[in-house]
Amino acid sequence: MGSKTLPAPVPIHPSLQLTNYSFLQAVNGLPTVPSDHLPNLYGFSALHAVHLHQWTLGYPAMHLPRSSFSKVPGAVSSLVDARFQLPAFPWFPHVIQPKPEITAGGSGPAALKTKPRFDFANLALAATQEDPSKLGRGEGPGSPAGGLGALLDVTKLSPEKKPTRGRLPSKTKKEFVCKFCGRHFTKSYNLLIHERTHTDERPYTCDICHKAFRRQDHLRDHRYIHSKEKPFKCQECGKGFCQSRTLAVHKTLHSQVKELKTSKIKC
């Protein structure tokens, strides 16, 4: 009975264009090579089919024992070169060029450790604990990965320590302290006017009556007394006032009179 070969697998991803699929079909049609010529290469087309299927699905490469594929007789290699060109990807990259993976405990495939699956049931516990695999590899604060982890720890800060989003930290307001009584002011002008109450300094003097004032706006309001024009007039009685605050007090008198009249009418 002749040797049976596995059929070529059909790719499950139609969008992926496999240029080596025709190459696999051509390899399946190669004549059977005696086992004494290929002592360590068993089922060439079958192994290649499995490898291509894993390469198509994106699975990790199989760890197969090192074979003597590089010692294939010239008859087979000449047959392969005559019929088609070599594929774009290596036939057995994990065999021809093994990737050295050395861990802290040893070297070789025996020292490889698979990462455990993430447990969503213990999500809060996993977020607070350190990863033992990272500690074994020496990812401390001095390493690049440790520095990145230190930057990511900013997200674990308490709400009091987190920087405000969208707002810059408020500047400290300047305080002006009175040297006489120790009262605080946020503006230097207010402190200047306040200190004049202690020193009784009145730099603004009326030209007509020579009355002095601590503030310039007070002198301005005083000058309306000497002039016939009163800038603030009552709309009900027509009486004029030099200051707006005296007009506001005058309006309260009119409102009180109106309330008394309405209360008498109800009675």
Curated annotation (Swiss-Prot):
A GO term, aspect molecular function: DNA-binding transcription factor activity, RNA polymerase II-specific
Gly residues bias (residue ranges): 138-149
SMART domains linked: ZnF_C2H2 (SM00355)
Keywords from the named record: Metal-binding, Methylation, Nucleus, Repeat, Transcription, Transcription regulation, Zinc, Zinc-finger
One Gene Ontology biological process: gonad development
Subcellular location: Nucleus
Disordered, as annotated region: 130-150
List of residues that carry Asymmetric dimethylarginine: R117
Family assignment from sequence similarity: Belongs to the Odd C2H2-type zinc-finger protein family.
Protein function: Transcription factor that plays a role in the regulation of embryonic heart and urogenital development.
Protein name: Protein odd-skipped-related 1
Annotated source species: Bos taurus (Bovine)
Gene (name only): OSR1
